[in-house]
Amino acid sequence: MKASISIDEKKDFIRWFLNKHQMKTREAMWVLNYIAGHDQIVKYVHFVDNLEGCARGLSLSAHGVESEPFLFFKGNIMTTDPEKAFHDIRLNWDEELYVELHFEEAMSSPEYALVREDNPFAAVKLADEEKEMADALIYQSVHQFSREKVLQQIDEALDTRDEAAFHKLVRILQQMDTEKE
């Protein structure tokens, strides 16, 4: 996660974006201009790659990409009506608003990279190889801990001269070692 992005950086980005890209709907441009004109709203705006898990989001598209032109959602309610979105943004200016922008070369844009944040609600997706490595590490750690615990119990059995416990624990240790192989 990067350091906090300033209000001025976000406003500069919105102005750059609107000058560089033609929105699919003029209302999308109006909403972005409205946001950029109000520092108290910009403070709560976060530009993200996806809106997964966000409580309140706005998805806007420029010409040249295959995405819905305008989507606004809050909780389980989704709308393509810019007036409803504008009304909610205006009235609930102090609520976090996550904005997803779709435009050509978005992922290679240095201007967008400057203001883009990680979505704190998105599920972390691990590759299968990473999952296998994590599982192996967990298994190895648990096995090592269990083995050390049994060795400690063997030492205690020797200290107390408990031959039955000693033989039982040695068998457990041998079984653990053969299972690991």
From Swiss-Prot:
Domain of life: Bacteria
Family affiliation: Belongs to the UPF0302 family.
HAMAP family: UPF0302
Protein name per its UniProtKB record: UPF0302 protein lmo1921
Species this protein is from: Listeria monocytogenes serovar 1/2a (strain ATCC BAA-679 / EGD-e)
